[in-house]
Amino acid sequence: MFKTKLKKTVGMGIVAAACFISALPASTVSAKERNDYTIESFHYVTVDGKDVDSQINMSNKADKDIKVTMVLPEQNQAGDWLAYGFTSRKSLQAFIEKDKQRLQDKFKITGSGPCCTDFYEYKNKGGQYIYWRDGFKNLPSSWNDRISSLSTASPSSSYSTTLWEHTSTQGYGKGVLFRHSDWYGKTANMASDWDNKASAIEIK
């Protein structure tokens, strides 16, 4: 089901619900403490499952090779979002299959609870919005390059939400992924790199 609903733009604080968050280095700063979930720059913790030396900045080439970024709801002291990088959809899928097994005892996919991810035209869940429950969807022209924030489905309903910069016929391009066990109850705002840039969405 793919529908658009009207919603008044409301200035609102971002409230973070208590969700499962993986253990992260002590040097990180909670996004909840910052009270800001604007997705901008990334600090890659792993790439294709391999640890990245935190003392060494990734080369520009390595950064360009990353096709999908899984954003974690934690930032380092510089304000960069901690993230897992993947150089292909195949490497991402391999991670997801293992991660689902790890999470299955915590969040059983039952289809209960909030079923869908909501996508909004403005930051902080403002303006019109659409919602999507499952699978891949090329956005219609009315929503192409229009998404500015999102609120994920429950982790008991599905695993993740991905924004793709291109449609499937255009090769997908880069993607930014939000794991529902991390982001449920939070509002992710897109900064310049992803604000009004998505041409397709995917719920797994």
Question: Which residues does each predicted region cover?
Answer:
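Sec-dependent N-terminal signal peptides of Gram-positive bacterial secreted proteins and lipoproteins
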Residues: 2-29
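Compact beta-sheet-dominated domain cores in extracellular/mature segments
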Residues: 31-204
